[in-house]
């Protein structure tokens, strides 16, 4: 059951990269958040999933405002979106079942969980690189 939620989350993330329209892309990102929430709620602290949900939704609405204000959005052909989706399934799927008691804010202070913190930073940098690539290097900031 949890695996199906994970696969739906990955599919909706891939669909958010395929769509050029900011509204559809934000919708698929919100759908991926809804599919990931059952996985995160099975970790040690349930409040952590609500915290992630609030941060993610506030970020999505900020991204939606900035992307919608862009005058032109360059369409970039993404030929390897299927390969990226399959690789992300194989890269992230074992993580959810091997680290179930680790995710808590207090656990980041101990030296045992530095690899988890490094992994989260790596995933965020990976996501930022894909986002800057699919924005066609135009940026989402307001022009002066």
Curated annotation (Swiss-Prot):
<feature type="transmembrane region" description="Helical">
    <location>
        <begin position="76"/>
        <end position="96"/>
    </location>
</feature>
<keyword id="KW-1133">Transmembrane helix</keyword>
<keyword id="KW-0830">Ubiquinone</keyword>
<protein>
    <recommendedName>
        <fullName>NADH-ubiquinone oxidoreductase chain 6</fullName>
        <ecNumber>7.1.1.2</ecNumber>
    </recommendedName>
</protein>
<keyword id="KW-1278">Translocase</keyword>
<dbReference type="GO" id="GO:0031966">
    <property type="term" value="C:mitochondrial membrane"/>
</dbReference>
<keyword id="KW-0813">Transport</keyword>
<feature type="transmembrane region" description="Helical">
    <location>
        <begin position="1"/>
        <end position="21"/>
    </location>
</feature>
<keyword id="KW-0812">Transmembrane</keyword>
<feature type="transmembrane region" description="Helical">
    <location>
        <begin position="47"/>
        <end position="67"/>
    </location>
</feature>
<comment type="function">
    <text>Core subunit of the mitochondrial membrane respiratory chain NADH dehydrogenase (Complex I) that is believed to belong to the minimal assembly required for catalysis. Complex I functions in the transfer of electrons from NADH to the respiratory chain. The immediate electron acceptor for the enzyme is believed to be ubiquinone.</text>
</comment>
<comment type="similarity">
    <text>Belongs to the complex I subunit 6 family.</text>
</comment>
<feature type="transmembrane region" description="Helical">
    <location>
        <begin position="26"/>
        <end position="46"/>
    </location>
</feature>
<dbReference type="GO" id="GO:0008137">
    <property type="term" value="F:NADH dehydrogenase (ubiquinone) activity"/>
</dbReference>
<keyword id="KW-0249">Electron transport</keyword>
<feature type="transmembrane region" description="Helical">
    <location>
        <begin position="108"/>
        <end position="128"/>
    </location>
</feature>
<keyword id="KW-0679">Respiratory chain</keyword>
<keyword id="KW-0472">Membrane</keyword>
<keyword id="KW-0520">NAD</keyword>
<keyword id="KW-0496">Mitochondrion</keyword>
């Amino acid at each position: 059951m949890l695996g199906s939620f994970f696969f739906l989350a990955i599919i909706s993330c891939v669909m958010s990269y395929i769509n050029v329209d900011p509204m559809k892309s934000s919708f698929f990102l919100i759908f991926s958040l809804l599919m990931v929430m059952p996985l995160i709620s099975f970790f040690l602290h349930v409040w952590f999933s609500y915290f992630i949900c609030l941060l993610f939704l506030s970020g999505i609405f900020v991204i939606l405002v900035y992307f919608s204000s862009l005058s032109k959005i360059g369409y970039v052909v993404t030929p390897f979106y299927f390969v990226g989706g399959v690789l992300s399934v194989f890269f992230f799927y074992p993580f959810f079942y091997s680290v179930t008691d680790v995710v808590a804010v207090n656990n980041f202070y101990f030296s045992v969980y530095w690899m988890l913190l490094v992994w989260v930073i790596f995933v965020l940098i990976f996501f930022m690189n894909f986002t800057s690539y699919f924005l066609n290097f135009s940026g989402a900031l307001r022009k002066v």
